[in-house]
């Protein structure tokens, strides 16, 4: 009967420590011992770890202290405390079962030793199997953490985003799962659900490893790998010197000095004003009106004289962008220009299949593909009405979630982790169905996916390590999120729960600088979230 019970535990219990504790109790009772323990070898630090214990441990611990010296010794049947080796299939020692008894005839017989060794032998394969499973899980988790760290390290400006979002998301899910009343009383995460969500939270931005960093960090409109405002300023410097030269030439041909210098100074002032205007537009801090864009175009019509070949010293890729013959030098160039070489078209080697009607769209994406892969035209970029991103830039950034889903669906997830691709990639969907990459409706999104969306937004608003924006205080962040609830972007019910539970404060005390932690008018935030969007 004892053997049957032990076999049932070995087959049914997935957790190694729980399994060993149950088996040890049955083991000790079956051989009528007083106490016992199971020690397993830890190769990473060459030590012995007690994984299970039953009864008094004084004598057991004394024997355990000598485990490193008894590997090849046979159990002494006259000892009151005996260690039985658990050997793997290749003969190496996985651990020991240590049993303490009274030393009576029953426990000093050869039959006791043989029976105990056989029972111990039953543990080897289940232990090896569970250790293999746990090592594979540890390896998978390590890969995931390494990938998240690589993304954060790749950009000094995203800092710990891939680490902070999982912390907040798990904080919220655990709190929801503990609810016994209210709207989330029926929400429960078992161990498998929790593991899937935790790993998904770590992987939620894994596609960013494919996103050009200069686009993620694009802090000004003219920024590519560097801020091209410096090129524009150099052209203004050329015109500035041209004005000085024109002044001197005018005087040589008889124009009065005062008149020539007045004309020069007027040009100086206009150039200074025009450059300051362009520089301000480059920041992207305010909405551009039609009048502002018209002035940009007018300034861009001015010309400067280029004397040097602009196709010297180029890479093969740069050369491939020129599809027309080089004009003879010197050549008049516009002060601001959208040149053909500023445009990179989609090609057969790289053309994301994200449009709904695309027959090669295998993942249900529903996104609009911009006409070009890249467009760094100067007027085109400076004319961005709000922010610093063109439609091409925005797609390149949003494409990270497309790549996340493609990457994660290629992995052979075990059954209990098969929700990870959806959990990880739906945090950019919206409650009104206007999100991306698949325009999911609210009814298609689980509570966990809504939690990750909320955590991602709150972390982004409060993060102090982004070059393209200043960090918001907690009160500012929550009010912005309340307005996002009005717009059916975030889940209103979940957001109100988040605010009223003050989970944001628990997170803030761990991850947000003190100067950003201000007073929050919870009632005002909740009222704003509940209000209908105008």
What are these regions (language model features)?
Residues 94-117, 127-130, 389-391, 468-471, ...:
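Regulatory loop-to-helix N-cap segments in sensory/regulatory domains
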Residues 41, 48-49, 53-80, 118:
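Acidic/proline- and glycine-rich, intrinsically disordered low-complexity segments
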Residues 1-2, 106-128, 138, 195, ...:
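Amphipathic alpha-helical "output/dimerization" segments
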Residues 143-534:
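Histidine- and acidic-residue-rich, metal-dependent catalytic cores
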Residues 78-90:
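A short, aliphatic-rich beta-strand micro-motif
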Residues 1-18, 29, 50-51, 135-146, ...:
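Signal-transmission linkers at sensory-effector interfaces
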Residues 27, 99, 109-127, 172, ...:
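Interdomain signal-transducing alpha-helices
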Residues 10-51, 159, 172-196, 208-210:
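Helix-loop-beta substructure at the N-terminus of cytosolic sensory domains
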């Amino acid at each position: 009967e004892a053997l049957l019970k032990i076999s049932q535990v070995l087959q049914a219990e997935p957790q190694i420590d729980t399994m060993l504790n149950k088996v040890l109790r049955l083991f000790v009772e079956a051989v009528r011992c007083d106490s016992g323990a199971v020690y397993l070898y830890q190769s990473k630090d060459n030590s012995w770890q007690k994984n299970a214990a039953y009864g008094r441990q004084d004598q057991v611990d004394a024997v355990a202290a000598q485990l490193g010296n008894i590997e090849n010794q046979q159990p002494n049947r006259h000892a009151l405390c005996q260690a039985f080796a658990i050997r793997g299939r290749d003969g190496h020692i996985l651990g020991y079962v240590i049993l303490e008894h009274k030393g009576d005839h029953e426990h000093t017989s050869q039959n006791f030793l043989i029976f105990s060794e056989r029972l111990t032998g039953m543990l080897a394969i289940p232990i090896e199997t569970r250790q293999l499973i746990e090592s594979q899980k540890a390896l998978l988790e390590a890969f995931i953490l390494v990938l998240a760290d690589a993304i954060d390290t790749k950009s000094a400006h995203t800092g710990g985003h891939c680490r902070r979002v999982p912390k907040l998301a798990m904080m919220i899910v655990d709190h929801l799962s503990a609810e016994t009343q209210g709207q989330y009383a029926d929400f429960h995460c078992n161990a498998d659900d929790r593991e899937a969500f935790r790993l998904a939270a770590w992987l939620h931005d894994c596609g960013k490893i494919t996103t050009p960093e200069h686009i993620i960090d694009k802090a000004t409109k003219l920024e590519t790998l560097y801020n091209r405002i410096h090129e524009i300023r150099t052209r203004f410097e050329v015109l500035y010197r041209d004005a000085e030269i024109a002044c001197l030439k005018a005087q040589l041909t008889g124009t009065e000095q005062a008149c020539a210098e007045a004309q020069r100074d007027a040009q100086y002032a206009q150039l200074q004003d025009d450059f300051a205007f362009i520089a301000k537009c480059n920041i992207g801090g305010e909405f551009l009106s039609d009048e502002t864009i018209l002035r940009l175009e007018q300034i861009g019509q001015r010309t400067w004289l280029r004397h040097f070949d602009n196709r010297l010293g180029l890479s093969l890729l740069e050369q491939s962008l020129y599809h027309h013959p080089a004009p003879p030098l010197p050549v008049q160039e516009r002060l601001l220009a959208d040149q053909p070489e500023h445009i990179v078209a989609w090609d057969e080697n790289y053309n994301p299949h994200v449009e709904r009607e695309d027959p090669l769209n295998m993942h249900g994406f529903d996104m609009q593909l911009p006409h070009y892969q890249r467009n760094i035209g100067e007027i085109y970029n400076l004319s961005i009405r709000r922010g610093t991103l063109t439609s091409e830039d925005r797609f390149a950034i949003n494409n990270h979630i497309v790549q996340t889903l493609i990457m994660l669906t290629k992995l052979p997830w075990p059954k209990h982790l098969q929700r990870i691709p959806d959990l990880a990639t739906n945090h950019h969907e919206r409650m009104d169905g206007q999100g991306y990459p698949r325009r999911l409706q609210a009814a298609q999104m689980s509570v966990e996916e809504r939690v990750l969306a909320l955590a991602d937004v709150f972390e982004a608003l409060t993060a102090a390590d982004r070059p393209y924006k200043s960090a918001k205080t907690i009160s500012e962040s929550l009010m912005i999120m309340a307005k996002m609830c009005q717009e059916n972007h975030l889940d209103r019910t979940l957001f109100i729960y988040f605010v009223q539970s003050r989970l944001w404060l628990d997170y803030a005390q761990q991850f947000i600088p003190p100067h950003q932690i201000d007073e929050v008018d919870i009632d005002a935030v909740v009222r704003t979230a509940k209000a209908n969007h105008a």
